[in-house]
């Protein structure tokens, strides 16, 4: 049975993976057929996956309800750990209820190579922590729930920036060893991270610049993490005209009558407005990690480890969250 599953995985991978891009419509259509076949043939291949979802094994699972965060710390499931080659798609479902609406969902690594796709269906208010990547050649970003609760979307492959909770990240299409880490749906807003050959690949503005939802790409100065970056944004200068002064301008000829003329004196007072966008410290720490796990678990292979139970590891410059203070006027 496992040989049949692996053969089907290889065939799907060969049919739907190429060098230029993915045909995600045909991929998901084929995947649903593949999932039905596997779920009917491997329901007894392993124990129940987590808190009430049978299937397990190559069919994914690791979910179900529960009072301690649904998926709990076990999470994961099936096909991704076998790796091999070709295409492996794993669906991680974090059950509702409990801590964070989904508990801690551990990632399922890609193993040897090929393609690993992680799709996370998070719960309310956080949806747990989902990460991906392993040693596979390509791993897709898995998004957690939004900060306000609700379901998370399925993040697909793209070479363009993807907006996640008003923050920009990239889905990596290469890289050795690390692949792409997953997305997080934390209690205070999601954020994404990834590796591309060991380098940052989540900032669409380039080195030395940061993306702002309000101002676009802004230059920053490289400073230690969790600092407030004061980058003055100069507003157009406003010219204020004073009241017009009137005076008589007599003609040169003695018998001519005088004529009043209006002379506009541009006695100006210039005001310049400074606006200080501030880096928010709530839920927007770009994390560099290169392991098969991550988030609230600990990274296993390479990169920077993430501390258990919170946000840690190696922080870099801010990603996209700004608090722009009210502009104050200064008289020149």
From Swiss-Prot:
Compositional bias (Gly residues): 48-81
Signal peptide positions (record): 1-17
Compartments where located: Secreted
Region (Disordered): 39-81
UniProt entry keywords in alphabetical sequence: Secreted, Signal
Highest taxon listed in the record's lineage: Eukaryota
The protein's name: Serine, glycine, tyrosine and glutamine-rich protein
Species of the source: Margaritifera margaritifera (Freshwater pearl mussel)
């Amino acid at each position: 049975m496992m040989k049949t599953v692996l053969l089907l995985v290889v065939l799907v991978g060969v049919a739907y993976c190429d060098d230029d891009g993915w045909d995600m419509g045909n991929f998901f259509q084929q995947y649903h057929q593949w999932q039905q076949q596997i779920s009917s043939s491997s329901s007894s291949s392993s124990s129940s996956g987590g808190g009430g979802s049978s299937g397990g094994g190559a069919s994914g699972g690791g979910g179900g309800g529960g009072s301690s965060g649904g998926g709990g710390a076990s999470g994961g499931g099936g096909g991704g750990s076998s790796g091999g080659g070709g295409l492996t798609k794993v669906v991680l479902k974090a059950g509702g209820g409990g801590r964070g609406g989904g508990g801690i969902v551990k990632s399922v690594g890609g193993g040897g190579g090929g393609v690993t796709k992680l799709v996370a269906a998070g719960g309310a208010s956080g949806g747990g922590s989902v990460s991906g990547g392993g040693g596979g050649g390509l791993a897709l970003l898995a998004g957690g729930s939004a900060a306000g609760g609700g379901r998370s979307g399925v993040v697909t492959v793209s070479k363009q920036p993807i907006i996640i909770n008003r923050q920009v990240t990239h889905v990596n299409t290469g890289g050795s060893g690390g692949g792409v880490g997953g997305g997080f749906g934390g209690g205070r807003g999601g954020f994404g991270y990834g590796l591309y050959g060991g380098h940052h690949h989540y900032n669409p503005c380039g080195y030395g610049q940061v993306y702002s939802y309000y101002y676009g790409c802004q230059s920053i100065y490289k400073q230690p993490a969790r600092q407030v970056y004061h980058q003055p944004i100069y507003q157009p200068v406003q010219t204020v005209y004073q009241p017009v002064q009137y005076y008589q301008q007599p003609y040169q000829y003695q018998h001519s009558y005088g004529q009043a003329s209006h002379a506009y004196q541009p006695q100006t007072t210039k005001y310049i407005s400074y606006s200080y966008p501030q880096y928010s410290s709530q839920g927007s720490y770009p994390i560099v990690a290169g392991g098969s796990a991550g988030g609230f678990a600990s990274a296993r292979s390479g990169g920077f480890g993430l501390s258990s139970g919170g946000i840690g590891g190696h922080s870099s410059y801010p990603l996209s969250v700004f608090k722009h203070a009210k502009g104050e006027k200064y008289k020149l």
